[in-house]
């Protein structure tokens, strides 16, 4: 007797926005709740600023068989999206357009068509939110193209507190990305296109890194004899990382026995000096 097991297919919704994209996500989730499962795979693509970025997002959405929901206020991006969505036969829903047109009719005024104006109600808060989202999106070398949009890029070997540092900086409104340096992986080419004063390298004493990694393996329930916590391997990684930092010409900070706050204070000092360049 054959048993027919049909896996539930969760609909994919791409949220395209020239701002944060939160509005589109809220509407998509509210609409999904009206269906039996209420489940939906939300993939937010925020801060779209060019036709190229819109095209890339649409190609991803097409590959995923997704519904495109957009909250674009820039007419050029909106027109391009709608044209390409029709050409690709992509289902798409405009969240912002009808509301803008409705208000335009009753106010007899034209919209400003400027993305993110609502953020100016509390610039500091939204700057922080934007930076946090940026840090999450471009954590651990994900999406190298985002490195060129970062205020700061943090590089270093594994377990030098790159991610905690970037999140700390994000809470200061600084868009920080980080890239792990591993001998077996060639660093992204974008890393070498960034001005040196916007890159900070983190290093650490080998003995301290050895203990940190050994504890990490213990926490994960893995053998402490793994290469990850091998002193010879650690020395090789640190030497390789310092070579990359030297090639870039960036500042290097020793994080040995330093709290994230201490490292961040030094990084902020470097950042503020660089802003004036």
Curated annotation (Swiss-Prot):
It comes from Carboxydothermus hydrogenoformans (strain ATCC BAA-161 / DSM 6008 / Z-2901). PANTHER family: PYRUVATE, PHOSPHATE DIKINASE REGULATORY PROTEIN 1, CHLOROPLASTIC (PTHR31756:SF3). One of its GO terms (molecular function) is phosphotransferase activity, phosphate group as acceptor. It catalyses: N(tele)-phospho-L-histidyl/L-threonyl-[pyruvate, phosphate dikinase] + ADP = N(tele)-phospho-L-histidyl/O-phospho-L-threonyl-[pyruvate, phosphate dikinase] + AMP + H(+); N(tele)-phospho-L-histidyl/O-phospho-L-threonyl-[pyruvate, phosphate dikinase] + phosphate + H(+) = N(tele)-phospho-L-histidyl/L-threonyl-[pyruvate, phosphate dikinase] + diphosphate. Its EC number is 2.7.11.32, 2.7.4.27. This is Putative pyruvate, phosphate dikinase regulatory protein. ADP binds at residues 156-163. InterPro entries: Kinase-pyrophosphorylase (IPR005177), PPDK_reg (IPR026565). Belongs to the pyruvate, phosphate/water dikinase regulatory protein family. PDRP subfamily. The keyword Nucleotide-binding applies. Keywords: Kinase, Nucleotide-binding, Serine/threonine-protein kinase, Transferase. It is an enzyme of class 2 (transferase). Bifunctional serine/threonine kinase and phosphorylase involved in the regulation of the pyruvate, phosphate dikinase (PPDK) by catalyzing its phosphorylation/dephosphorylation. Coiled coil: none annotated. It comes from the Bacteria.
